[in-house]
Amino acid sequence: MSNTSEDNITVRFVTENDKEGWQRLWKSYQDFYEVSFPDDLDDFNFGRFLDPNIKMWAAVAVESSSEKIIGMINFFNHMTTWDFKDKIYINDLYVDENSRVKGAGGKLIQFVYDEADKLGTPSVYWCTDESNHRAQLLYVKVGYKAPKILYKRKGY
């Protein structure tokens, strides 16, 4: 187990130098959800995170004492017909298994909340698998479970 504590964790936007650490967690995230994406999608997404003209971002949780990236969150801005203000969708959130329950997940979500407020888009939402009970223990502390059911187009 890591010695990571909430006070020892900083969250910041990714930089070009973070690609390897972000990619390591991105691959672990895919393993967790038993999915696999092509490697060139990593480059494509990371490029979008760094492009100031694209409203898609990534942030990382860094263990201050070791400078190790222990968590990542990917999020983007979109319009809605339900409000004049845009919304923020958290697309992906992952914390290294050895660093969980130390505050990184909550700090990553709070980072998105803070950025959403700065953008004037305070509405932030995300979804998770019904079976991801451990994550839901955090999510009910930082948000609420919406009474919605997600449907998807068959085959996609």
Swiss-Prot record:
Gene field: HPA2
The entry's keywords: Acyltransferase, Chromatin regulator, Transferase
Keyword Lyase: no
UniProt modification remark: Autoacetylates in an intermolecular reaction.
Listed EC numbers: 2.3.1.48
Protein name: Histone acetyltransferase HPA2
CDD domains given in the database record: NAT_SF
Quaternary structure (record): Forms homodimers in the absence, and homotetramers in the presence of acetyl-CoA.
The species this protein was found in: Saccharomyces cerevisiae (strain ATCC 204508 / S288c) (Baker's yeast)
GO cellular component, as recorded: cytoplasm; Hpa2 acetyltransferase complex; nucleus
Reaction equations catalysed: L-lysyl-[protein] + acetyl-CoA = N(6)-acetyl-L-lysyl-[protein] + CoA + H(+)
InterPro entries: Acyl_CoA_acyltransferase, Diverse_Substrate_AcTransf, GNAT_dom
Keyword Metal-binding listed: no
EC class (word): transferase
